[in-house]
């Protein structure tokens, strides 16, 4: 049986950084600040073991991406259209949070001047998944063919994703929640999104857990939209728990039969 190896989770990351995260430590202003400082580091630079204590983290992550991921995918699968592969990876990074079809990604790459067929896009996506660069989350409400051809893709580590994005904290937040869920529950039909009249970021059947991800819900329109989606999903799927995960906001509302919890990212990761 293959062993799935993931980057450090947040607890392991804090252990290596020697930052305590017990309840007593987090009650103090200083203790909470130390933990939040490390969270920002983990959020942007990920959890690859060798890079945790490095100062030149971006250089290290570029090296990991180019020498391990990119070179491995190219060499192991005898890819000749390297530029097309690079463009495809960048476009997947820019499409975090959105379902993306094989034909659409092939068309996007082809507009850059390097032709990429839909068949090649399918193969490249499979290569990226098998190398653990990305993981797939499918639409629970979709038919089988659409599940495979119109999925969402997330990067296994936030540090690699951050190489491709500028000022994109919302994408990094959703990616980190996705990678944490997949780490906890597995890759194979354990974590889904739901999109059929209702858009819900994640649903975990094993836990009957529905999750919306929003960097902040201080804006009233944003809050109403996220609440509406969670209230609606309860009428379609069994939901023992409905969560909104934010970067650093917390609340609880009894707006549905089970209530809706607003939980900050750090508390979710340390659960």
Enumerate the language-model features and the residues they cover:
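Conserved AAA+ ATPase "sensor/coupling" helix adjacent to the nucleotide-binding pocket
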Residues: 16-25, 67-68
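Amphipathic alpha-helical "lid/sensor" segments that cap RecA-like P-loop NTPase cores
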Residues: 25-65
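Accessory nucleic acid-recognition modules appended to NTPase machines
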Residues: 52-210, 215
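A short helix-turn-beta junction within AAA+ P-loop NTPase domains corresponding to the substrate/partner-engaging
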Residues: 1-11
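Terminal-proximal interaction/regulatory segments of ATP-powered molecular machines
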Residues: 212-219, 223-226
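Short, hydrophobic beta-strand segments that form beta-sheet elements in well-ordered domains
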Residues: 192-194, 240-246
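Domain-level recognition of nuclease-like catalytic cores that cleave nucleotide substrates
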Residues: 248-271
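Short, charged, amphipathic alpha-helix that recurs within catalytic cores of restriction-modification
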Residues: 223-236
């Amino acid at each position: 049986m293959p062993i799935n190896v993931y980057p450090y989770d947040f607890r392991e990351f804090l252990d290596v950084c020697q930052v305590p995260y017990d309840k007593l430590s987090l009650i103090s202003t200083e203790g909470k600040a130390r933990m939040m400082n490390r969270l920002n580091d983990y959020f942007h630079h990920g959890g690859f073991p060798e890079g945790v204590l490095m100062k030149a983290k971006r250089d290290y992550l570029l090296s990991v991406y180019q020498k391990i991921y990119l070179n491995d995918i190219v060499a192991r699968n005898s890819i000749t259209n390297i530029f097309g592969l690079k463009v495809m990876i960048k476009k997947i990074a820019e499409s975090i949070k959105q379902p993306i079809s094989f034909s659409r990604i092939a068309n996007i790459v082809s507009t850059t001047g390097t032709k990429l067929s839909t068949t090649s896009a399918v193969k490249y996506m499979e290569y990226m998944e098998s190398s653990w660069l990305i993981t797939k989350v499918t639409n629970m409400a979709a038919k089988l063919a659409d599940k495979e051809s119109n999925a969402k893709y997330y990067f296994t580590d936030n540090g690699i994703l951050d190489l491709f994005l500028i000022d994109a904290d919302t994408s990094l937040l959703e990616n980190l929640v996705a990678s944490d869920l997949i780490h906890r529950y597995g890759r194979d039909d354990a974590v889904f999104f739901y999109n059929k009249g209702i858009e819900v970021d994640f649903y975990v059947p094993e836990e009957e857990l529905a999750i919306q991800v929003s960097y902040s819900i201080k804006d009233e329109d944003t809050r109403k939209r996220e609440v509406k989606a969670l209230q609606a999903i309860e009428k379609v799927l069994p939901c023992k728990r409905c969560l909104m995960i934010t970067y650093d906001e917390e609340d609880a509302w009894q707006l549905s039969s089970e209530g809706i919890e607003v939980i900050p990212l750090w508390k979710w990761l340390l659960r």
